[in-house]
A protein has these predicted regions:
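N-terminal amphipathic alpha-helix/helix-capping segment at the start of soluble metabolic enzymes
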Residues: 4-6, 14-44
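Catalytic domains of carbohydrate-active enzymes, especially glycoside hydrolases
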Residues: 49-58
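Metabolite-binding pocket within alpha/beta catalytic cores that recognizes anionic/polar moieties
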Residues: 58-110
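Conserved anion-binding
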Residues: 27-28, 91-153
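Surface-exposed amphipathic alpha-helices with a cationic face
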Residues: 51, 72-77, 124-130
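Hydrophobic faces of well-ordered beta-strands that scaffold small-molecule active sites
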Residues: 31-35, 57-59, 83-87, 111-113, ...
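Short, acidic/polar
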Residues: 38-49, 93-101
């Protein structure tokens, strides 16, 4: 029994090592730190504090509404960091296309859109041949519970 458990543990550890090798992503690139603050100084203070231990940051509505696109520019141009722009975009085709072109110009690495097919098509069209930003399509917000979903139909 103990030997079987040891073999199972060894097999699991080997599988985990193989999985880690398959990913081959450094730890600092696996973590995305949310800059869920409302001012540029606080956001950049956190980036400075974390230094080279983190390479990926999430910017969203709160920081964008208070600091504009400056955090993205600072992260990309001055700090050489990766940016996940969590905007959950959903708009008419032309607006999405133009927004995605702007994301490409800014060098955004990941962007979120809402989960409808027209938005996804427009996002892909706007991104063009660029491999970035990666597009994450949100089908529903995780802050909704079962009652909320039933109420929505």
């Amino acid at each position: 029994m103990v030997m079987a458990m040891a073999e199972d543990l060894s097999t699991a550890q080997n599988r985990e090592k193989q999985h880690d090798m398959d990913l081959d992503i450094p730890a600092k690139d696996r973590l995305i730190v949310a800059l869920d603050v409302n001012n540029l100084d606080e956001a950049m203070g956190l980036v400075n504090e974390l230094g080279d231990t983190v390479s990926f940051y999430k910017d969203g509505f709160e920081l964008m509404l208070h600091a504009g696109l400056e955090p993205v520019r600072m992260l990309k141009l001055h700090r050489r960091k990766n940016v996940f722009f969590d905007l959950k975009m959903d708009d008419v085709k032309e607006t999405i296309i133009k927004a995605m072109r702007g994301m490409v110009e800014l060098g955004v690495d990941i962007v979120t859109i809402h989960g409808n097919g027209d938005t996804a098509k427009a996002a892909l069209e706007g991104r063009g041949t660029s491999p970035r930003p990666k597009i994450v399509q949100i089908t529903y917000l995780t802050s909704l519970d079962g009652d909320d979903l039933r109420d929505l139909g």
